[in-house]
Amino acid sequence: MKTYHAFVATLALAIGGALLCVGMGFGFGASSSSAGPNIEGTYMLEYRETADGKRVMAPEIVGMLSYSKNVRNFNVYWMMGGKQSSISMVAKYTLSDKEYIEDCMYYAENMDGKGITYNTAATHGVSPVTMKDGAIAFTPALHGEPMIAISKSGLIATKTGVFTDHWKKLD
């Protein structure tokens, strides 16, 4: 009887292990390395460091960035020198460990209070990707954007000689 129970317990363990392995193969557990890096999440702008070392925070600057599986939604507003500026964007993207590809569907900007401009013409950009110490970095090829470095804790956007924005990952 003990042998029978041991056999059943061993069989149950083996079946459970096999199911776990099959489940992982279908994406229920570990992710496939060929899927590329994952930047999905919502990021909130905490503060901007200007080139002269000044720290700018809300309400002078407010921003939110969301990456879903394949869509990016970006909104940022700032006030500098008494002039309001804002950028809003919706784009599809793909990301691998080698490149970031973006297809912009909507882009709007109001720079230095000059009035808003809209662009719904499809634009396409490809940027090389670098990965180091668990972070991914790239400079989106469209609209003169800053270099972006994303880690598990958040995102840092750097426009050399102009600003460095610090974004916290919310989810």
Question: Where in the sequence are the language-model features?
Answer:
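Lipid interaction determinants
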Residues: C21-S88, S96, I101-D171
